[in-house]
A protein has these predicted regions:
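Conserved redox-active cysteine motifs that mediate thiol-disulfide chemistry
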Residues: 510-527
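Oxidative protein folding and maturation machinery
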Residues: 168, 173, 246, 256-504
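Conserved segment of the thioredoxin-like fold in thiol-based oxidoreductases
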Residues: 530-571, 580-583
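Short, solvent-exposed, Trp/other aromatic-anchored flexible loops in extracytoplasmic proteins
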Residues: 89-124, 128-131
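Conserved helix-turn-beta segment immediately C-terminal to the redox Cys motif
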Residues: 504-505, 522-543, 614-616
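Short, well-ordered beta-strand segments enriched in hydrophobic/aromatic residues
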Residues: 55-64
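Thiol/disulfide oxidoreductase modules built on the thioredoxin-like
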Residues: 569-613
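A non-transmembrane, solvent-exposed segment enriched in polar/low-complexity residues
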Residues: 139-334
């Protein structure tokens, strides 16, 4: 009887409890899709905000290197538009002030609980700690809210009239001034305009980082060698691709309140302003016109497919995408040409990467579980290799048009040992000169005679003069071998190097100037070298033309050992011989020149010392 009465009471209370729950829910204001105006970090982001009576909750997502740690300072705070601060009170999923080690997938979620803010709050800032370099996220607001940041209506709604075509492109160096304005910017953001652009013949892109003025403006000066692309923007917000011509001035503006949307950039000026607007203003819509991953296409293919069948798939995909570009409404002729050349560049890249993608597709379908299984399968695969494109890929705008340099794709002509044929005489000269400047090819007298354009010819002469000066300087260094072994056949190059050190153990470090792990390895090995300085061991460093000679020369001054700068073919042969899929690659040879140890990637000093000591033992 008592049980029945208790049940009756509970049933009567249920509606009341439901009402209480509903009332509590209504007291909580939620931003389901918070956006930010600027963050000085890409490691953490706010995914949801809740305003309750007792607390303001920020739901956070973090991405960082697996097994490395992050930390949220106990002093973290929120600040509203009036400057009032709300301190961190507790957290779930992370302990404030303590190191949190990232899981194997490099991602984690946690919740930060702050003192309650007014539920009518429209925008807030987050500061993780008090130090200058601690994480900061500015202008957090709900996606439905549009902050007033003083956007000039006439600029935001600027009309771009008329069509535009790409200019005839020639090597004609000149400066481009880029005027940048970020609306919604505040001095405390301390942001910079970052960007990059390519220069004919230079192996690495030129980069810039210019601090924004207090009013959100900045000026960047780029030295272009021909009409081409300058990428500029604010890190963790957005980047614009600006198509510019040497000698002109261009401008653009960024709406930080909508920084990650298609219409974030506006107010373009310059000879291709309309083209810049339609490309940067339609990024999401244009995504479907891009080529998808070639690796994915190959993975879905049949094991029995031939190279010709894969090539046919590439051609079919390229044709379909080009047709989609040509029918896409609202683009200028210049924008269509740029998009078509981008597709052609991707198609050439797919052909160039055929062997790698073919191998990776086979490995994916094999469902490899361990490193041993991976190595075993790799040895059993008969990977096809090509010294020329799978099919005749010409004619292409990327190679044959009078604006081909704009797409910066002529360098792809020498991606193969058998170059892609270019019929346009000027473009052929550009491709040859660029390949020479980047160290991909050498120029004999007959080849140099084909360079008839005076400006391009002067580039060749300048490179030869610089190389001569460099060689004279390096000749005075007994431990540096810059192109001194060019006449040695690739198959004999490593034996020729090792013969010099018979009777000693040799550690070979295959590296490049642009390789971060390689440079880290050089620093890490300094104590090891000091420890072994009285032993019969030599450290040999090998690189090739992917490393700019001037940069290489500067860097090797701080690396004890013998340094070899080889030809592309010699360098590639060593990597192929020792099945190196990456750098740094470390090889240890004993006193008789026999390989005793190989490792791709970082090696602990203790392990390396152990292997060197084994190599030093006389058999």
């Amino acid at each position: 009887m008592k049980t029945n009465k208790l049940l009756a009471v509970l049933l009567l209370l249920l509606p009341f409890a439901a009402l209480q729950t509903e009332a509590s829910r209504k007291k909580t204001t939620v931003w389901e899709k918070p956006v930010t105006m600027y963050a000085n970090t890409g490691t953490i982001e706010v995914t949801r905000v809740e305003f309750a009576d007792t607390a303001t909750l920020l739901y956070m997502h973090a991405e960082h290197t697996p097994k490395e740690w992050i930390r949220i300072a106990a002093e973290s705070r929120l600040t509203d538009a009036d400057g009032k601060t709300y301190r961190l009170t507790s957290a779930d999923g992370i302990v404030p002030g303590k190191r949190f080690v990232m899981p194997d997938n490099g991602e984690t979620d946690f919740t930060l609980r702050f003192a309650p803010m007014p539920k009518g709050t429209k925008m807030m800032d987050f500061a993780e700690g008090e130090a200058k370099d601690d994480w900061r996220i500015f202008g957090i607001h709900d996606d439905s809210y549009s902050p007033e940041i003083g956007l000039p209506k006439e600029l935001k709604e600027k009309k771009y009239e008329g069509d535009e075509t790409l200019p005839v492109t020639r090597y004609a160096p000149g400066k481009v001034k880029v005027r940048f304005k970020a609306y919604g910017y505040r001095p405390e953001m301390e942001a910079k305009v970052y960007g990059w652009y390519s220069v004919l013949g230079e192996k690495q892109q030129r980069r810039f980082a210019v601090k924004l003025n207090d009013d959100g403006t900045a000026e960047v000066e780029a030295e272009l060698t021909h009409p081409s692309v300058i990428v500029a923007g604010i890190r963790n917000v957005n980047y614009a691709s600006i198509f510019a011509v040497p000698g002109e001035e261009v401008s653009l503006a960024l709406d930080l309140a909508n920084g990650q949307k298609d219409d974030a950039f506006f107010g373009f000026t310059g000879s291709l302003a309309h083209t810049n607007k339609v490309i940067n203003g339609n990024v999401s819509r244009l995504q479907r016109l891009f080529m998808s991953s070639y690796d994915s296409l190959m993975t879905t293919g049949t094991d029995g497919w031939s190279a010709a069948e894969y090539a046919a798939l590439i051609s079919k995909t390229l044709k379909e995408k080009k047709e989609a570009v040509n029918s896409f409404k609202g683009l200028t002729d210049a924008a269509r040409a740029i998009l078509r050349m981008n597709l052609e560049s991707t198609a050439l890249g797919w052909q160039y990467d055929f062997s790698r993608s073919w191998e990776q597709a086979k490995i994916r379908r094999a469902n490899i579980k361990t490193a041993a299984e991976y190595e075993e399968l790799r040895k059993s695969l008969n990977v096809p290799h090509f010294d020329a494109p799978l099919t005749d890929v010409t004619p292409m705008e990327l190679l044959e048009s009078d604006y081909a340099m704009f797409g910066n794709g002529l360098s792809s002509a020498y991606s193969y040992s058998t170059p892609v044929v270019i019929n346009n005489a000027y473009n052929r000269q550009v491709a040859t000169v660029e390949a020479f400047l980047k160290g991909r090819i050498s120029l004999d007298a007959a080849a140099e005679a084909t360079i008839t354009d005076p400006a391009l010819s002067s580039l060749v002469a300048g490179k030869r003069a610089k190389d001569k000066q460099l060689q004279e300087e390096l000749a005075r260094r007994g431990n540096v071998f810059f192109h001194k072994l060019d006449d040695v056949k690739p198959a004999d190059i490593l034996a020729t190097i090792l013969d010099k050190y018979k009777g000693k153990a040799v550690v070979v470090d295959i590296w490049a100037t642009w390789c971060g792990p390689c440079k880290a390895g050089h620093k890490r090995m300094k104590p090891l070298k000091e420890d072994l300085k009285n032993e019969d061991v030599v450290f040999v460093y090998i690189t090739g033309p992917t490393s700019p000679a001037e940069t290489w020369l500067e860097m090797i001054g701080g690396i004890d050992g013998d340094h070899y700068y080889l030809t592309r073919e010699q360098y590639g042969h060593i990597l192929d011989t020792y099945e190196s899929q990456g750098i740094p690659t470390y090889l240890v040879f004993d006193r008789e020149g026999r390989l005793t140890f190989k490792n791709i990637g970082m090696v602990a000093n203790d392990k390396m010392k152990e292997e060197i000591e084994k190599a030093l033992e006389w058999l």
